[in-house]
């Protein structure tokens, strides 16, 4: 079954809108899913075509200097991680859909100028985190994951599989593009908000790929520590931890073999 489930409130509707549309974003591959899984088991970044290149290195050298460019790569190489590991799957195997329609299909939601339109955005993808915006319109977030929230106006938002975000927009022009680009910037889903069928607005170019930072990589660790009161006393075997700098450049990954996992309380 493919679709969204909208549950109306038991009492009066608290969010005023003249028109209401559901926009369900998803992704699809024509490959055998088990073949996709087998590829990822062999090589986790099989579908990542945004790997750092020699041209990126020379660009960083010209902008930041040789030392900074080398240090930037040294850190990631020592961790044996990719700074562009943003998604397991990319447009190399996925098609990004809006209400089951490809970007070329131009699914359209209708409105009349001056109406308050509620767009119920649903991420029904199996893999993709989407960054959503509507060029030319502000998005007022009013409802998140089944709960009304204090309205906040944004230009763009990111949501992952299983999340829902409702926004209010007040369009004035004839057509707007609902643009949802994948977090790894390899593709996008799009729909159109228009006064009649057949119209479309310009589709933005994909944003440049941004490297992950240490805050991205360490965020999960810090959340896990605060939420579960993780004890570090059992990690004495990690001799490399003693010399770990803020950039983790000096981290001795070879010493992790002596890590006493039994002493870690979760």
Model-flagged regions — what are they?
Residues 165-173:
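Short, hydrophobic beta-strand segments
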Residues 129, 173-174:
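Ser/Thr/Pro-rich, low-complexity mucin-like regions
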Residues 174-205:
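Terminal connector regions
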Residues 1-133, 137-159, 167-168, 197-249, ...:
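Histidine-centered copper-binding motifs that mark active-site loops
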Residues 162:
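Ligand-binding face of N-terminal immunoglobulin V-set domains in extracellular IgSF glycoproteins
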């Amino acid at each position: 079954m493919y679709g969204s489930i909208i549950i109306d409130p038991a009492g009066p509707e608290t969010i005023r809108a003249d028109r209401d549309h559901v926009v369900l974003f998803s992704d699809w591959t024509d490959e055998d899913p088990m073949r996709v899984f087998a590829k990822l088991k062999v090589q986790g970044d099989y579908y990542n075509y945004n790997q750092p290149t020699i041209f990126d290195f020379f660009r960083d050298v010209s902008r930041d200097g040789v030392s900074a460019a080398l240090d930037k790569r040294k850190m990631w190489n020592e961790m044996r991680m990719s700074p562009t590991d943003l998604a397991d799957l990319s447009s190399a195997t996925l098609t990004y859909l809006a209400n089951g329609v490809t970007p070329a299909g131009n699914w359209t939601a209708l409105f009349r100028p001056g109406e308050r339109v509620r767009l119920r955005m649903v991420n029904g993808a199996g893999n993709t985190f989407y960054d959503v915006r509507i060029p030319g319109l502000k998005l007022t977030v009013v409802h998140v994951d089944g709960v009304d929230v204090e309205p906040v106006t944004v230009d763009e938002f990111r949501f992952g599989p299983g999340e829902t975000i409702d926004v209010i927009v007040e369009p004035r022009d004839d057509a707007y593009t609902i643009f949802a680009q994948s977090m790894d910037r390899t593709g996008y889903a799009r729909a159109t908000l228009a006064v009649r069928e057949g119209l479309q607005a310009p589709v933005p170019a994909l944003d440049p790929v941004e490297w992950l930072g240490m805050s991205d990589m360490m965020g999960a660790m810090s959340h896990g520590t605060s939420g579960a009161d993780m004890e570090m006393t059992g990690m004495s075997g990690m001799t490399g931890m003693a010399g770990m700098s803020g950039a983790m450049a000096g981290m001795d990954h070879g010493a992790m073999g002596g890590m006493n996992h039994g002493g870690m309380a979760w």
